[in-house]
Amino acid sequence: MKIQNIVLVILLMQTHLVIAQQSEIKSVTTSHKNGTLMVIGGGKLDSTIFLEFKKYAGGDTSRIVVIPTALPDDYLLTDSAMFHIRKGFEKYGFDRVTILHTRDTVVANTDEFIEPLKTATGLYFLGGRQWRIADGFLHTKAHKEMFKLLDRGGVIAGSSAGATIQGSYLARGDTETNQIMMGNHEEGLGFITNIAIDQHVLARNRQFDMFDILKNRPELLGIGLDENTAIVVHGDEFEVIGASYVVIYDGTFWSREGSSLKNLPMNDAVFYMLKSGDSYNLRNRKVIVE
């Protein structure tokens, strides 16, 4: 009987170890090993961010696809919508621009629809409501082609809703309002794993909203981007560019001046900010200090 009890204890310990290891694996945050991601916080963007996108897309030889699906139909169906979208990129020297839009996953699964993605060097998601992108593209052939674009060393960028959709967890994914952090759409396109991404954070005083997600999904890394600010992601690391700040929710605190004497809140209620030039390791969830 004692031997059976010992065996049972050992089996339970091994089971708990496997579960813990699986949990640890699931909570690893990283992006695609190839290519570049640009996650942009929305608002009016300086030319610096667009030119950075152009650089990673191949400069003057770039071939980009623009996905405006996050925008509402009452805009997209106007006669001038596609003209203005195209002009917005042409003024930065993008000569080969394809606008790709659907709200139908059947269409997004057709070879004809995904053809422009097969030769694209860059992809850009416009802002609006991120759940619209999920409805049209999630788990389709078009979605798979986006990963292949990264495999080729291309760049995927997106601003506002186009930022949030790049994460694995879809923040503000409710169809009724953007004020609900955990809505009826919770899955993003997953270019970065185990992450929730918010935007317009400081401009709209959203810096505390991320905790609504993290108290229910504590394994996630939370990132909030302010307007005219972006992170440029390569593999496990990103660098901040732009005019404002990126808010980090990783359960720790970091400051250039140190934090040992600061009276900080509990780990589940703390955040800190990074500015242009700062770098962060997603896998380790730590600021990179040179």
PLM regions and their residue ranges:
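Catalytic-core regions built around general acid/base machinery
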Residues: 116-119, 141-153
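Structural motif
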Residues: 39, 122-126, 157, 197
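Short internal beta-strands
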Residues: 65-69
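Bacterial Sec-dependent N-terminal signal peptides
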Residues: 1-27
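Short beta->alpha junction loops
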Residues: 99-106
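C-terminal and late-domain segments of enzyme folds
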Residues: 21-60, 71-83, 87-96, 170-172, ...
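Catalytic nucleophile loop
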Residues: 125-127, 146-170
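Glycine/threonine-rich flexible loop motifs
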Residues: 130-139
